[in-house]
Amino acid sequence: MKRVVILGGGVGGTIVANLLAKKLRPEEAEITLVDKTGKHVYQPGFVYVAFERQNPKKLVRDERKLLRKRVKLVLGEAVRIDAEARKVYLADGRALDYDRLVVALGARLTPDELPGFQEAAHHFYSMEASLRLREALEAFRGGRVVVTVASVPYKCPPAPSEAACQLDYYFTKRGIRDKVDIHFLSPLSRVFPLEPVNPLVEKIFAKHNIRSTVFFNVESIDAERKILNSIEGESVPYDLLIMVPPHRGAKVVEDSGLGDRGGWLPTDKFTLRTKAHPDIFALGDCTDLPVSKAGAAAHFQAKVIAESIVADLRGQPATARYDGHVMCYCDAGYHKGIAMSFDYEHPPVPPPLGLKDWLGKRFLNRAYWLLVPSGRV
């Protein structure tokens, strides 16, 4: 019997496991998913936790309940991948053999890479950090809020811009918007990562008095004086700092010598096989793919990988290809949203701003558990 091992119980790994369990007969393959915690977390909800619009408990479910019964769930942390021997070693000493391996471990937050980050900055890229940010926002009575990113790449590129819009909406509802200066700092030449959508976001910022500075790449934080310094030589003071932390690829990828300088796993952008080892697939945030690091990308990639593994195990040509498709929603506040859909060949069409796409995001947040991990959509 063939053995498929999947590392990571996020959206991508869960979909791959469930699709394989659906497509392959029990005698064809044993499907094992390895996850460190056994808890599946809906990360797009973190920003809503920070702004008191989401119950944290509703963002977490048991991974076992999301998997088909025949998928074997192993609780443990992968610490080494021996690609030549086709083995994965876990922290407790167990070793798992595989015929096909799927790496879906996401990105790793590394705030210690930027001195001063832990003392000075807040963020919403983990549940704990979102709850701390919520407390900081509740206590904030006025001053300058700076929103920026420590470095690129990072998960969910639109998230910082979205957070700036949420800050405006949040402080307006509290009746203290006139006492708050929101300043958005972008490392790019524009405020929004997707160029076709940037003019719309600039208009939103202008309408709601959100200041912006481009070409601001963070060099250091002076936590004592509350000043942020850029590589370009600018300095910006703050009273509250919200900063996306530095990211790296999965630690096991780095420790196994499989990653690039950032720890990202070099992956073919169409087949999603790793470039050095065709029997290892990778998807989502842990890869070096030229697409957004987002759950929506992993969602579409998972289906390609599942089809390819089924073909491999049955001795058939693997013809499935990933076209770079990503779809995401951005909440602009005031019950207005932006929907963006794009792929390698088709950039996003500048969308209208309206209620429909805001409702689309709200619907997805609520329907995620029913529709996405199972691979139904």
Where are these regions (language model features)?
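Flavin (FAD/FMN) cofactor-binding core of flavoprotein oxidoreductases
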Residues: 191, 224, 321-338
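Glycine-rich, N-terminal phosphate-binding loop of Rossmann-like dinucleotide-binding domains
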Residues: 9, 92, 105-106, 149, ...
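Internal hydrophobic alpha-helix adjacent to the cofactor/substrate pocket in enzyme cavities
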Residues: 169, 298-324
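A Rossmann-like FAD-binding core segment of flavoenzymes
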Residues: 26-32, 71-85, 96, 172-266
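FAD-site-proximal beta/loop scaffold in flavoenzymes
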Residues: 117-141, 235-303, 307
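C-terminal auxiliary extensions adjacent to catalytic cores
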Residues: 336-377
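Beta1-alpha1 glycine-rich phosphate/pyrophosphate-binding loop at the start
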Residues: 1-72, 151-195
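FAD-binding core/adjacent interface of flavoenzyme oxidoreductases
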Residues: 3, 70-162, 168-175, 242
